[in-house]
Amino acid sequence: MNEAKEFNEAVEEKTDGVKEVLDSIDDNNVDSDLEYEFPAGYYDKENGKLIKDFEIREMTGADEEALAGVAKKNKGAKIINKALERCLVRIGNMTEKSVGGIDAWGKIIQSLCVPDQDFAIAQIQKVSVEDEIESSHVCPECGQKIRTFFKLDELEVEPYRGETEQVELFELPRGYKDKKGVLHKSGVIRLPNGLDREIVLPVAKTNLSKGTTLMLTRLCTFDDGYPMTESVLREISLKDRRYLENLNKEMLSFGIDLSVDVECNNCGSVFKGSINSLSFQ
């Protein structure tokens, strides 16, 4: 999920089949007594309040059917949002019913930052399927394909040390000079959320650089109001671009650490790999 952690994919589209299953599920028929805390938390902008506690339930057969429809379209990040929309039953005092229904709840789920989403998905997988993840890697030394298994409990969770508002200030080393000769250098960058991942991931899978450009246009805002467009990000110096990319990576260095040590049985070398996804298979 490393790629998904840095960039990510598509607009909310609900098929009639999935909507039918969503409407038919009865949350009273499943246990919902599994409580956790997000590493960063949901920031309620209206009230200036940070909410960290949340509650999940175990997945059902209806959930599996609904997610299978999304998986068929090969929409990895949308599966995460859909699974959370269904199985994350409470954030603070908010529930699907209290916020006005599935559409409003879905937007709240999409607004959760990526590391918080990944943390919640890991807990849902642990109680619903199993505590073990299978991951595939290729040895960089000999090219051997390796299948490895990891326990979810073995993955470290790094604490969030950033701002409550989940933004950081930036100051570009060189800055962007517009057609009027005005220099734009400073602004804010926020953490990527589930909607960012949904929109950007398909682009990043095809062209990683374009995915990075799209993600940064969504995350960055100049403090003077000048729009941070794709053309701006293509015209700024590589030094400025790398600065924003690295700042984004630093901001994302919390939550579940998906990097693992992998040993090659063929040549014996040990290398750092990443767990690409948490699936419900």
Spans of model-derived segments:
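Short, surface-exposed, charged amphipathic helix/loop patches that serve as local interaction elements
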Residues: 2-281
